[in-house]
C-alpha cells in the first residue's frame, strides 16, 4: 500500500504550494471530492522508487467551534487519522503563533509520526527565525521553500523514513500465483457493501488461506470456480467470527490505495443518480493508474426506460475515456446480472497481462500504415519502422521510427483500435509510446 502523508498547518502557510510541488509528477490534484471531502485534496507523489499519497487540508484550528472553521478542523482531523505520517507546515517568515502551539499540542497527543517543515525559508537556513519553532516540542525544524522547491526532496525522505515501506515484490508474488486482486470502487451508497456481501455469501465462493500482503487494509482471499481472487477492501470489510461482512464506509485514501493495489477494478455506479463528478474522478484515477476495469451500474431495476436511456448517454459522454471497459447493468439487492461480472473480470485481467509478439505487432503496424499513413506535419512525415511490447498490466506497445513526435492523437487511437481487435484486449487500458530514432546528421547540419 502507498503511504499517506497529510499536510497540516494554520491558514496561508503554504500547504497548497507544497502539495502542488509534491504531486507535480502526477498532475497535481488527482481527486477533489466535492462535498464529501470539502477541504481535503488527494494527490499522488513520487520520489525515486517510492510513491505516496498526499492529503492537502484547509487551515487547521483544533479548537474551532463554529461554522466553516469547525468543518475545516473536522476535515483536517480526518486527514490526520487517515495518514501514516503528518507534515506540520509552519511559516518561518510569519513567525511562531498561538495557533501553531495549539496544533502542535494536538499532534503530540496523537503520537503519530510528525515532521516539522519550516516553509518560506529562502535564505534563512541558519536564521534565528527557525530556532523559535523548537518551542513546539516536535523536534528539528526542516527549512523548505515550497515555492522554489528547496529542501522538499529531503523533507519527503524524512517523512517516509520511519514507515518501513514494503517491497514491490509482494505484488509480483501474488501475480505468480495467478491470484486476481479485485477492488470494488465507487462513491458512498452505490451498493458496494451489498454487492460484496452477496459475493461473500455465495456457496461457490470458498475462502482460502493466504498471508496478508497489504499494510493496514483488510483483504479477503477467496476462490470461485477454480480461480483464486483477493478482494481488496474499499467498503469497510469487518470480520465477524469466521465470516467477513462489508459495511458501507467510504474512505478516499482506502479507495485510492485499493485501486493501486488491484489488478482489476470494478467501478460501481448508481443508476438512480447518474454519472456524478465523484464517479468521474474515481474513473479518471483508475485510468491514470493503468488498472483493468469493469463498469457495473447498480440499482438498474429502480429506473424506468427513459432513465436508462439518459444514463447510457451519460456514461458514453462522461466516461468516454473508459469505452474499452465492459459495461454491466445489475441489481445487487435482487442479485440480478451479477453472474456475468465474473467472466468480464477474468477477461479484463487476462487482457491486461496479454503477451504480444514483436513480429505480430510489427506486421499489424505495417498493415495499418499501408491502410492509412500518418499525416505530414509541416516538413515532417512520421515514419514507423517496427513495434514491440514494452510492458503488461497495463499493456504497453512501443513504436520506433522517425519524426514520431508529430503523430497525432487521432492516429494513435486508430492504431490502438487495430491492436485491440487483433489481441482481443477488453477491459484494460492500452498505452502506445512513440520512440523517435536519433538523427546522426543533425549535429553536422547545425555546426
From Swiss-Prot:
InterPro entries: G_ENGA (IPR031166), GTP-bd (IPR006073), GTPase_Der (IPR016484), KH_dom-like (IPR032859), KH_dom-like_a/b (IPR015946), P-loop_NTPase (IPR027417), Small_GTP-bd (IPR005225). GTP 2 binds at residues 186-193, 233-237, 298-301. It comes from the Bacteria. Keywords: GTP-binding, Nucleotide-binding, Repeat, Ribosome biogenesis. PROSITE patterns: G_ENGA (PS51712). Gene3D superfamilies: 3.30.300.20, P-loop containing nucleotide triphosphate hydrolases. Residues 354-438 form the KH-like domain. GTP 1 binds at residues 9-16, 56-60, 119-122. Residues 3-167, 180-353 form the EngA-type G domain. One of its GO terms (biological process) is ribosome biogenesis. CDD domains: EngA1, EngA2. Associates with the 50S ribosomal subunit. Belongs to the TRAFAC class TrmE-Era-EngA-EngB-Septin-like GTPase superfamily. EngA (Der) GTPase family. GTPase that plays an essential role in the late steps of ribosome biogenesis. This is GTPase Der. It comes from Acidovorax ebreus (strain TPSY) (Diaphorobacter sp. (strain TPSY)). The gene is der.
Amino acid at each position: 500500500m502507498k503511504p499517506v502523508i497529510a499536510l497540516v498547518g494554520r491558514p496561508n502557510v503554504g500547504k497548497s504550494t507544497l502539495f502542488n510541488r509534491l504531486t507535480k509528477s502526477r498532475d497535481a490534484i488527482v481527486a477533489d471530492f466535492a462535498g464529501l471531502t470539502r477541504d481535503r485534496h488527494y494527490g499522488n507523489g513520487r520520489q525515486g522508487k517510492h510513491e505516496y499519497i498526499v492529503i492537502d487540508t484547509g487551515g487547521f484550528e483544533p479548537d474551532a467551534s463554529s461554522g466553516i472553521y469547525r468543518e475545516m478542523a473536522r476535515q483536517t482531523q480526518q486527514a490526520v487519522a487517515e495518514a501514516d505520517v503528518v507534515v506540520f507546515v509552519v511559516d518561518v517568515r510569519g513567525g511562531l503563533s498561538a495557533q501553531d502551539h495549539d496544533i502542535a499540542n494536538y499532534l503530540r497527543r496523537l503520537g503519530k509520526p510528525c515532521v516539522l517543515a519550516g516553509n518560506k525559508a529562502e535564505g534563512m537556513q541558519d536564521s534565528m527565525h527557525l530556532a523559535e519553532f523548537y518551542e513546539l516540542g516536535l523536534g528539528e525544524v526542516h527549512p523548505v521553500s515550497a515555492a522554489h522547491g528547496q529542501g522538499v526532496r529531503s523533507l519527503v525522505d524524512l517523512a517516509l523514513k520511519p514507515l518501513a515501506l514494503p517491497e514491490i515484490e509482494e505484488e509480483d508474488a501474488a501475480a505468480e500465483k495467478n491470484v486476481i486482486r479485485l477492488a470494488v470502487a465507487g462513491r458512498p451508497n452505490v451498493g458496494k457493501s451489498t454487492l460484496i456481501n452477496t459475493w461473500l455469501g455465495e456457496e461457490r465462493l470458498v475462502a482460502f488461506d493466504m498471508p496478508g500482503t497489504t499494510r493496514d487494509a483488510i483483504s479477503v482471499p477467496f476462490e470461485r470456480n477454480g480461480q483464486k481472487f483477493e478482494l481488496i477492501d474499499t467498503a469497510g470489510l469487518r470480520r465477524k467470527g469466521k465470516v467477513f461482512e462489508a459495511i458501507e464506509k467510504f474512505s478516499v485514501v482506502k479507495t485510492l490505495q485499493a485501486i493501486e493495489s488491484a489488478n482489476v477494478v470494478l467501478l460501481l455506479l448508481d443508476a438512480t443518480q447518474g454519472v456524478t463528478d465523484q464517479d468521474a474522478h474515481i474513473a479518471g484515477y483508475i485510468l491514470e493508474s493503468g488498472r483493468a476495469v469493469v463498469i457495473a451500474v447498480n440499482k438498474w431495476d429502480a429506473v424506468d426506460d427513459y432513465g436508462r436511456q439518459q444514463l447510457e448517454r451519460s456514461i458514453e459522454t462522461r466516461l468516454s475515456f473508459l469505452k474499452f471497459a465492459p459495461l454491466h447493468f445489475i441489481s445487487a439487492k435482487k442479485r440480478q446480472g451479477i453472474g456475468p461480472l465474473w467472466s468480464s473480470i477474468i477477461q479484463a485481467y487476462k487482457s491486461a497481462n496479454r503477451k504480444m509478439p514483436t513480429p505480430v505487432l510489427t506486421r499489424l503496424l505495417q498493415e495499418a500504415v499501408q491502410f492509412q499513413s500518418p499525416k505530414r506535419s509541416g516538413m515532417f512525415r512520421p515514419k514507423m519502422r517496427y513495434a514491440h511490447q514494452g510492458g503488461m498490466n497495463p499493456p504497453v506497445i512501443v513504436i520506433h521510427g522517425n519524426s514520431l513526435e508529430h503523430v497525432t492523437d487521432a492516429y494513435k487511437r486508430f492504431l490502438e483500435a487495430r491492436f485491440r481487435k487483433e489481441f482481443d484486449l477488453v477491459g484494460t487500458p492500452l498505452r502506445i509510446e512513440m520512440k523517435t530514432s536519433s538523427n546522426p546528421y543533425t549535429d553536422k547540419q547545425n555546426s
